[in-house]
Amino acid sequence: MAAPAQPKKIVAPTVSQINAEFVTQLACKYWAPHIKKKSPFDIKVIEEIYEKEIVKSRFAIRKIMLLEFSQYLENYLWMNYSPEVSSKAYLMSICCMVNEKFRENVPAWETFKKKPDHFPFFFKCILKAALAETDGEFSLHEQTLLLLFLDHCFNSLEVDLIRSQVQQLISLPMWMGLQPARLELELKKTPKLRKFWNLIKKNDEKMDPEAREQAYQERRFLSRLIQKFISVLKSIPLSEPVTMDKVHYCERFIELMIDLEALLPTRRWFNTILDDSHLLVHCYLSSLVHREEDGHLFSQLLDMLKFYTGFEINDQTGNALTENEMTTIHYDRITSLQRAAFAHFPELYDFALSNVAEVDARDSLVKFFGPLSSNTLHQVASYLCLLPTLPKNEDTTFDKEFLLELLVSRHERRISQIQQLNQMPLYPTEKIIWDENIVPTEYYSGEGCLALPKLNLQFLTLHDYLLRNFNLFRLESTYEIRQDIEDSVSRMKPWQSEYGGVVFGGWARMAQPIVAFTVVEVAKPNIGENWPTRVRADVTINLNVRDHIKDEWEGLRKHDVCFLITVRPTKPYGTKFDRRRPFIEQVGLVYVRGCEIQGMLDDKGRVIEDGPEPRPNLRGESRTFRVFLDPNQYQQDMTNTIQNGAEDVYDTFNVIMRRKPKENNFKAVLETIRNLMNTDCVVPDWLHDIILGYGDPSSAHYSKMPNQIATLDFNDTFLSIEHLKASFPGHNVKVTVSDPALQIPPFRITFPVRSGKGKKRKDADGEEDDTEEAKTLIVEPHVIPNRGPYPYNQPKRNTIQFTHTQIEAIRAGMQPGLTMVVGPPGTGKTDVAVQIISNIYHNFPEQRTLIVTHSNQALNQLFEKIMALDIDERHLLRLGHGEEELETEKDFSRYGRVNYVLARRIELLEEVKRLQKSLGVPGDASYTCETAGYFFLYQVMSRWEEYMSRVKNSGTACPDAAPDAAQVATFFPFHEYFANAPQPIFKGRSYEEDMEIAEGCFRHIKKIFTQLEEFRASELLRSGLDRSKYLLVKEAKIIAMTCTHAALKRHDLVKLGFKYDNILMEEAAQILEIETFIPLLLQNPQDGFSRLKRWIMIGDHHQLPPVIKNMAFQKYSNMEQSLFTRFVRVGVPTVDLDAQGRARASLCNLYNWRYKNLGNLPHVQLLPEFSTANAGLLYDFQLINVEDFQGVGESEPNPYFYQNLGEAEYVVALFMYMCLLGYPADKISILTTYNGQKHLIRDIINRRCGNNPLIGRPNKVTTVDRFQGQQNDYILLSLVRTRAVGHLRDVRRLVVAMSRARLGLYIFARVSLFQNCFELTPAFSQLTARPLHLHIIPTEPFPTSRKNGERPPHEVQVIKNMPQMANFVYNMYMHLIQTTHHYHQTFLQLPPAMVEEGEEGQSQETEMEAEEETVSAQGNLTPSPADASLSQETPAAQPDCSSQTEDTSAPCDIATAAEPVSAAAEAATPQDAESVPTETE
């Protein structure tokens, strides 16, 4: 197998390069935003830039990046565009800038939307240029860029401006391009289209000739473009050299065709045009397909196009076609061919009279039609309306090969899509893993196209939706598997021994050489399948390794996935491995196959089952694992061996590799998706079209739902009637009781709901439009029935005063339908979620709610808040791992709940025993739940009924007299039982009050027996597993899990009969599209319908998306787009929370520009912590400029493992300064945008202050991506980069970075780089308005009483650079130590001898510690050149380090830092460093 060439990484230009560039000088003169006096617009500038900078450099990305970064498009090109100045250079410049924006994944159409007037003219010019001759004004390379621009347009149909232009190209009138017979056939198939067609013809007749000609040009554009492509394709020879421009043009063209076919609005009309052009036949017969090197990607793209042209969908209705319907279409085609043959071609009588199954295979068709002449074939095709009729006495102009392929490919039997999927192996093999076209390297730049599906706004059918996600999920995991294989195998250092075998010169923790491999079982296939049902093998390895690694291998559990690898190295013993060179040829990797562990074998060869019993101790170091192989892959390999004489792969394996369990769940998720595609997945009708991206996006909003609920009990949502009135501005609130004393929560609210034609319209936010009718809400206060006399009987209540927007979100969540809540940072997303859950629980006690989150941390936060509300904990259940992190003493996992039920049962039976005793009833009523039930029925209930009868009858003697309150207490039968409740139970003030108390007491008793009846199942079910299943299926009302757990366990949950009515998703914008979809289908449909009633998604699409490690999948396939984000883009109504209560108002301003209307809650202005300044620091937020330290800015020891020593030291110095002032270390977190910097900062903290009790460690040192969803009072942020902005250019990452701090944010960065970035301007314009040097007030200790923004009474010191700060902190620390020492001597008055003795002991101890620490940290720590630089900059602050023995954890020379590559970084491999462009962990 040929090793793929290593792609080159695109290096972004540095600041100095940017400044030196000719383009930058022009930008500063004509369009740079920071320049006040700009030169007037000059068209020659555009011509010059295009010719000299873009064309001359062969459209080099570096040049185009520079132009786009300088805001060339926004500030010069489009701002000055008009038909008068339009030219080739102008058009191409705009196209290049738009394409670059899409490559960088930044919004591209905003500029055009602001000034849309000339866009139609510009678009027409693009169309004209795309059809120009390739050897004319526009080169093929330029036309390829135009195709890419058109592709972006077709994929941006959600933008009104673009859609209005594209619709002129693709609509019913484009069928003008069909041959007349084919047009007639299509109109006959769909009769309603004929009416529209006649209307179009009429309208065309009314148009003036010029407009008609223009319309015809647009309608025939794609037909003409296809013809142009075919001519380019035919110009490529079979073996002679070919320019890559032609190949790239063809690849981009097929990509455009795929995208047009994969979108229903474009496919509806275009698929017929494409079919009529026979493009696929031309492509499959072309020379390019047969050119191995150049045509590989083209062939893969062509297969994708073939798949989509024959997709199982009705183009006109958009309905998915069933297997039977597809078979009927196939039979109709064959029979129409047979009819034509029978009527007109006597030589085809045998074919015409055969049954379909005999003649629809490719071989049969070739046998029948191959002998026919070209003219005859043409006539057959013309009878089927595939080609125009052949005139009499004329020969066909088509090749016989083309005509034969046209008929055969159209009529051959097809394998159904689901069959293909079921035959596909789930594990990747070496052919896929190292195929750069489908699994690109981390260096993917976004330039070329790839044979990958794209996730855009719309999908053809649910099958298409699942299939695209299936393929992308599979390939994304393949990319991670490739990284693991390359890391493990290269660590093992496979070399060729002198006898030609393999010798391993190294070792790897995650891989072991295989001693023996045997296939032990190949089970028979199921009926109708040709692959075995099961294939099992035994793998033996020798675990001569450290104990903890041995434990890891022996700890492999059932269903863990491993990989079997064959290496045949050709390099001799001792050859060094070079990571920069292709991996495969260095290690000689030949095969990779996946397997799934069944278990380890014991001494007798039996599988050791997973379970609570301890594992047997096995002797020796040899271990054998029984594994399941992929039956589909095994079948393919065996077929290849038998038919083609290939080597038996299963005799060759010599390495087994395991993976981290956390990253190794891909097979289970793929199986889940495949199972979904094999079942009739029933999505609720009200969601189906929205998920596919069609129809009215607001159709699932509660205001449009037919089953909208008029009256809702808001329970404890409102704190008072005033709160309720404030929550519904613009509504008339009518309370059913007039007494203010009775207008107390809880409230039931009746909303005006009308259906049919008079239904109220809602705007995009779900707010009702003003109508003539008054918006009247009828509010009914109601009293929660008394639950008993004990304090714990009182319900827990909500204490949060929700804003009116939060109330709208809660109201929407309680109603049936789809609710989308956009929650900016600090706006109370979790509180809203918990209140919705509580309200659904109380309003619909029979319904079950599923909670799904992205992370265990979010699930824990939800659970901690749910427990604070009035929800019975026996109805809560948590599935999956992570519950151990819950900060509560209660265990909500399955077995935790089982234990709770068993313990609670015993408690309740004790209560029954006490009740029995108090009533003087003999026997053992509390023996079981069953006996307790009989006791309640015969002893308790009878007494209660008798009591009620006596109390009522006591008032009948004198009908006019009011019932006597005293008799309520007198006749009460349970006085003795309630003797331990707060006394007196009955107040004696009124009959009604006492009667309510008596009923409350009975409710308390009744609840005991109700719970025991529920717990009765735990007496009947004996095993913990059965009990936990019962809890899941019957008992729990609120079930929580992560999206990953849902994807892994869907099969088990469905099998158990799991049911739910509502789904609430937190962190919805961070969940992968497919992982959001799977939880909708964790239950079987009832009578063919889904029972799902509500889907509430809460998230923030302006923060970071799901983590996708491979850049190609992230950008090219848009795999990072969550379902939540897609719904927002499609236009589904959202409730946008608009008041934050986390951060100071000034900090909120750094990111609130990204949201519609984000304000602050009142307490942000009022509470002292927000109004007080940050002690010792002049500003509450500041951007601090960091220049090169020792001539170095950013460094990159491994790919994408960026570090910046100067910033790292500066950040740690500020942290130490704050701690020395008295700030609690746990209130400070250090964030950075790259993993490399994170490791460097951690190293420096370990060296500087980690073990120092005066300073300590910050709360967290981590990346911005990992810190999403968390917060702290003070954030120190390092942006690392000095050459290019990098991935902070993604505004979502900027929003996360700016919104983590509550009280103080201090950012360390190269200001000259970041301030010029267009996307970051709103935040950086505020940051750069303040001084760019750190301003500190060293004499102001923490906490301070100074108000934020006040000028301090103390002197402000300006820190110019990192070395100055480092020395300042060192001196401050020494001063503090001396002051403390002086205090000890003066005030504690210790005897001098003790002081000296103590100092001496401490000195010796700390010296020894310092020595150990120094050796462990660096081996041999010598002063670095930083000493010299420090002494030059700050001569006064150069202490004598040698005398420092009082506390060596202080920085000896604080600038003598770790080297740019930290200790951790040096050892880091690409796997450890996670060399990921997105730099997420």
UniProtKB/Swiss-Prot annotation:
Residues 754-773, 1396-1481 are annotated as: Disordered. Residues 1418-1448 have a biased composition (Polar residues). Signal peptide: none annotated. Its main location: nucleus. Induction: By retinoic acid (RA). Keywords: Acetylation, ATP-binding, Helicase, Hydrolase, mRNA processing, mRNA splicing, Nucleotide-binding, Nucleus, RNA-binding, Spliceosome. It catalyses: ATP + H2O = ADP + phosphate + H(+). ATP binds at Q801, Q806, G826, T827, G828, K829, T830, D831. The keyword Nucleotide-binding applies. One of its GO terms (molecular function) is 3'-5' RNA helicase activity. It is found in: Nucleus; Nucleus, Nucleoplasm. Residues 1455-1468 have a biased composition (Low complexity). Residues 417-1481 are annotated as: Required for assembly of the IB complex. Residues 1-416 are annotated as: Helical region with structural similarity to ARM repeat domains. Its EC number is 3.6.4.13. GO terms for cellular component: nucleoplasm; U2-type catalytic step 2 spliceosome. Contains an N-terminal domain with structural similarity to ARM repeat regions; this domain functions as a scaffold for protein-protein interactions, but is not required for RNA binding or for ATP-dependent RNA helicase activity. Identified in the spliceosome C complex. Component of the XAB2 complex, a multimeric protein complex composed of XAB2, PRPF19, AQR, ZNF830, ISY1, and PPIE. Identified in a pentameric intron-binding (IB) complex composed of AQR, XAB2, ISY1, ZNF830 and PPIE that is incorporated into the spliceosome as a preassembled complex. The IB complex does not contain PRPF19. Within the spliceosome, interacts with SNRPA1, SF3B1, SF3B3, SF3A1 and SF3A2. Belongs to the CWF11 family. Involved in pre-mRNA splicing as component of the spliceosome. Intron-binding spliceosomal protein required to link pre-mRNA splicing and snoRNP (small nucleolar ribonucleoprotein) biogenesis. Plays a key role in position-dependent assembly of intron-encoded box C/D small snoRNP, splicing being required for snoRNP assembly. May act by helping the folding of the snoRNA sequence. Binds to intron of pre-mRNAs in a sequence-independent manner, contacting the region between snoRNA and the branchpoint of introns (40 nucleotides upstream of the branchpoint) during the late stages of splicing. This is RNA helicase aquarius.
